[in-house]
Amino acid sequence: MKINEILREQIKNEIPRERCCLVTALKVALRLYGTLHITGRGFMVEFKKEDPALLRRTIRLFKAVFPSHKDLEILFDDKKYWVQIYGPRSVWQELNLFSEKEGFLPDVSVTRDCCLMQFVREVVLYKGYLVNFEEGYQLEIREPGPFTGILMSTLEKWEIKHYSYPGRLLIKGGEHLFAFLNRLNCQETVERLARYREFKKDKDQTVRLTNYSMANLNRQVDGYEKIRLVLEEIRKGPGLEALPPPLREI
């Protein structure tokens, strides 16, 4: 498994238990990759994602939040799947896709601490990347878009050191990254990343020892080749028997 997939796999496979956290997970997914339409059948949200596992996860989340809602259509072509979900205004209002006062796409509302943690987990799932991991611990959150303000205020609240650049946030260094992951209850990922890091160290050490041994072997071969040429000249000249016993033994 690639290093970047370790964190995503844990978050993707862990479905929240509380309904408020399920709603928060849906808010992030649909705001990032959903499109709200007005059709003859009412409001419809179309969710597209190239990763079918994330599409299935979103459908599972929606059914968990709205178990009585059955109006879902799963479509596909040769390259990807997507889902169309029809529902009344009340559904999309709860998911912060529509507001009677603000209209379409109002600000995302996250209040409870458990929901805030789930919010950050979902953003990391879709927008987080572990980069240059062989050189050092570093997590990049790319193009968080409408969630930038909430992310930055949350990191400051959690006292996680981070760096802000246009279109991305960075968390650098093992101490800060592991503190961030522990805040997200991603201890399994922390342990796996630590094992991965040790594996890389052992692998690099093995490569260095192998290169050192090969260099020594090459020097020995080169030295033997030089001696062989000298001995060949002696054999063609006076002969090995003409040498004193100590030199002949060498």
Segments the model singles out, each with a brief description of its role:
Residues 1-42, 48-58, 62:
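N-terminal, positively charged regions that mediate nucleic acid binding
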Residues 26-31, 120-125, 248:
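Contiguous, well-ordered alpha-helical segments that form the cores/surfaces of helical PPI scaffolds
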Residues 183-250:
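Extended mid-to-C-terminal alpha-helical interaction segments
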Residues 18, 51, 173, 216-219, ...:
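Helix N-terminus capping/helix-initiation residues
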